[in-house]
């Protein structure tokens, strides 16, 4: 398969979710993150620099909270409960925290791809875009990153764990636990 054909086939996995989102927006429905931020994870962490992939479920569903990086919020925003639990575990493991706000772009700058299983959600409706076709695109991303070696895949929650079967555990490391949200963090995230 030539490079041009391969790129086209990879982009075709975006057709269904993007059509859905554009239809929602044309019908005055709000999505999170906003249209300009949907692919920020890939803008801030290039394929070639990726060392770690942290999988979440879907973006924060509150208006203007999600910024395109899984678990991240804009600087000076209050910390969502999931991110508080992530920071609590980092503090517990290494005793310090490099940043005190929820803006995780510095992680992406260091090679951490902060990726949700669904890249969008309807404002006010958690998991609302879990079946609009993001899975095919995310599968393509996992497949591409999996071709590298010594990548750490961090899978938080059942939606993220669906991708385990596509990761070569002989050349990459998988760390998985429950989602860091307060609803499930006690099932294995806290203390992991």
Model-identified regions with their sequence ranges:
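Short Lys/Arg-rich cationic patches that frequently serve as NLS/NoLS or arginine-rich RNA/DNA-binding motifs
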Residues: 1-5
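A polyanion-binding, active-site-adjacent surface
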Residues: 11-155, 159-162, 167-168, 173-178, ...
């Amino acid at each position: 398969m030539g490079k041009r054909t391969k790129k086209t086939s990879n982009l075709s996995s975006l057709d269904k979710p993007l059509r859905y989102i554009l239809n929602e927006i044309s019908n005055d429905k709000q999505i999170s993150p906003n249209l300009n931020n949907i692919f920020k994870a890939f803008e801030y962490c290039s394929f070639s620099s990726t060392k770690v992939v942290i999988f979440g479920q879907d973006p924060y569903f509150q208006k203007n909270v999600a910024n395109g990086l899984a678990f991240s919020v804009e600087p000076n925003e209050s910390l969502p409960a999931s991110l508080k639990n992530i920071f609590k575990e980092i503090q517990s493991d290494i005793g310090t925290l490099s940043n005190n706000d929820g803006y995780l772009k510095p992680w992406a700058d260091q090679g951490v791809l902060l990726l949700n299983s669904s890249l969008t959600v309807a404002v006010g409706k958690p998991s609302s875009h879990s079946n609009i076709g993001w899975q095919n695109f995310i599968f393509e991303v996992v497949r591409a990153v999996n071709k590298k070696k010594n990548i750490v895949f961090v899978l938080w929650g059942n939606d993220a764990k669906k991708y385990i079967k596509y990761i070569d555990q002989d050349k990459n490391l998988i760390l998985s636990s429950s989602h860091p949200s307060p609803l499930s963090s006690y099932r294995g995230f806290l203390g992991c």
